[in-house]
A protein has these predicted regions:
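Long, contiguous binding/interaction regions
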Residues: 1-95
Length: 95
């Protein structure tokens, strides 16, 4: 299987979103993810009931600025913390 060419300035990565108060924060998280649908490749959400926490993994393909804006808006939501790992522009380990 061949690798798709990477557009100039585009980065592939995963954004981990930890949601502490799902009932209050989920609508805002979903609204932000919808706003950035153009860079979202896919997402998977897991409710971790034992810790009263939800974890969402979001695969993104966008510029550093777009991904930074997405993570900034998500991280500004009360009860939400975010961490992104991006693929190096030329491949290899995440930076």
């Amino acid at each position: 299987m061949s690798e798709l060419p990477q557009s100039n300035g585009q980065r592939l990565g995963v954004v981990a979103v930890f949601v502490e108060n799902r009932l209050e924060a989920a609508p805002r998280v979903n609204a932000v993810l919808s706003e950035y649908a153009g860079i979202v490749v896919g997402r998977m959400g897991i409710p971790y009931r034992e810790r009263n926490l939800s974890v969402v993994a979001v695969i993104v393909d966008g510029t550093n600025d777009e991904i930074g804006a997405l993570t900034g808006k998500l991280g500004a939501i009360p009860g939400v913390s975010v961490k992104a790992a991006l693929r190096k522009k030329n491949g290899g380990e995440a930076v």
